[in-house]
């Protein structure tokens, strides 16, 4: 008979994964959050289906044809399933950056990175509110120090409360983006290469957008319109400052072009062409 034993510390180490890192610097997570926000959330199924619903383009084949004819896609639970999952995955990553850059976190002191993540968290929260109305948000996409969900069944939030969360993220971002980082995130920032002033303008642009979204619910529209004008004055001055995800090339194709090339499911919209002609829009030529 052979008996063996080990210390309690050794037993504690057995079930730990030593082959993978347990934490990543926030600036590296930032690259993924920017990419998934632009490519999958703003440029994925929401882009293709909604362009058909509002007649920017016309669905001519496969699922976009069914979206065009309203046969099944608008009400099918699977239509936006991928986007739904990715919105929360992206929001989770943004919140991880925010937590790591907050007091006590491994990236504490990197205020610019934190501000960038707060802008992106606001953007994704607002996408959830715009597309799904009431939805989990305040308790969703939160993880503990071990990466496990804090809430397995997050509560439903009212759409208006999700907007409040988005606006709070933007207010926090505006404060943080006017401070500095201990480590330069420019090489991981695919939007503005670490330019905090442009991120600040992006934050104000979103505040203007979301304030306008809520105007029909406003109790003082005149005051809120003044806020919109104030936010706009602090935002982009030209199209070169806009938050454009300009990384596409022959090896990294735009998701809309990739979808069209693979499936040819979208065509030119007569409704859109007629509207451009009505206003003598130069883009027709």
Regions found by a protein language model. Give the residues of each.
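Membrane-proximal, proline-rich intrinsically disordered regions
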Residues: 6-55, 88, 104
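Hydrophobic-face positions in mid-chain alpha helices that act as interaction patches
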Residues: 222-285
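Aromatic- and glycine-enriched pocket-lining scaffold segments that form the walls
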Residues: 188-240
